[in-house]
């Protein structure tokens, strides 16, 4: 896979809390220029991103995060945020699981949290962020299987806000355990070589704020 070919697998991401409208507009322009898969932002920017991409007749998708970055919001709050994101034009929803529910064995509430977001998302594809850095291998597999059971399209490894991001071994683990769910690797992927390794391990999407560096052969500086 060539550098430019990998662009179509990249969610071009800006999730810093200090991001300005000018920053988001630049992100959108870059996504259009390089042909990235999506523009991924906080929900407050969803309508702006939708309007920009539509105005430029771009096939780039609008991706909005829900319950980001900690996933500890009430399920009702996640439902409302998802509803708003879809109403404002999101094509994809990246939701953060409730890690505490999973680690506590509160599996009914854990599943309900995911299922609620998937249901409200309608035709928007849901990527379930399982924050692998906090989980055992058994919990990673359980989270991936639950995401699939609830109708999610993807499992996503990380928010980029935890102590570590994507790991090749986690992608391989999920791919082997749940072969019929797509995987988004995110967190710390800054070079073409890293992105290629994750796609070879089984990732179908790469979440990064270093998309331009990846496709141009440079090295990104962001932690996400």
From Swiss-Prot:
Single GO cellular component term: cytoplasm
Enzyme Commission numbers on file: 4.1.2.4
SUPFAM superfamilies to which the protein is assigned, alphabetical: Aldolase
Native source species: Methanocella arvoryzae (strain DSM 22066 / NBRC 105507 / MRE50)
Upper taxonomic lineage: Archaea, Methanobacteriati, Methanobacteriota, Stenosarchaea group, Methanomicrobia
Function statement: Catalyzes a reversible aldol reaction between acetaldehyde and D-glyceraldehyde 3-phosphate to generate 2-deoxy-D-ribose 5-phosphate.
Compartments it resides in: Cytoplasm
Single annotated GO MF: deoxyribose-phosphate aldolase activity
InterPro entries per record: Aldolase_TIM, DeoC, DeoC/FbaB/LacD_aldolase, DeoC_typeI
Stretches of the chain forming a coiled coil according to its record: none
Name of protein: Deoxyribose-phosphate aldolase
Homology family: Belongs to the DeoC/FbaB aldolase family. DeoC type 1 subfamily.
Pathway: Carbohydrate degradation; 2-deoxy-D-ribose 1-phosphate degradation; D-glyceraldehyde 3-phosphate and acetaldehyde from 2-deoxy-alpha-D-ribose 1-phosphate: step 2/2
Catalytic activity field: 2-deoxy-D-ribose 5-phosphate = D-glyceraldehyde 3-phosphate + acetaldehyde
Active-site residues (renumbered): 94 (proton donor/acceptor), 156 (schiff-base intermediate with acetaldehyde), 184 (proton donor/acceptor)
CDD domains: DeoC
Pfam family, one: DeoC
One of the GO biological process terms: carbohydrate catabolic process
Record key words, sorted: Cytoplasm, Lyase, Schiff base
